[in-house]
């Protein structure tokens, strides 16, 4: 940015998934920059961020593993029930989530507390393991499985949930172990439009 001596600069606050904006600083220093004050010299400025913390609540009935945050700002939490218990779901900041199974991947938008919900296993009942889009869910024999939210994949259209090549009906009682997978259809490419947009942008910049 070019600014006249003594003027201020309006700068939009940048964002980074999984992080809080911590301010603008002179590059290589701990000197904060306040753009509401008049600018009187050249500056080389960088934005800095603080990573949100994800804390697991300890339980006597199982354990939780919290991954490192990836480049997309995602954190993966994995629950493992102790013998005699089954995993039933997640609570995030004390509230139940729509996430059905484990592991659970999400982008924190603030410092977050994650708790795994466990249930004591009834030895008189039969349970089945259902893997749905990589998440493991334990379902009692004869019960149905809640349909999860439709997954999103960039450049693709979600067309349904499938088991062994056939679309799965979530009203079907679970009577055995299952692997349910999301199926997608590739959307038409728009390279031509993208190229035109880039050329238009370059023209404006010149």
Which positions does each model-derived feature cover?
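Secondary-structure capping and domain/repeat boundary segments
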Residues: 1-206
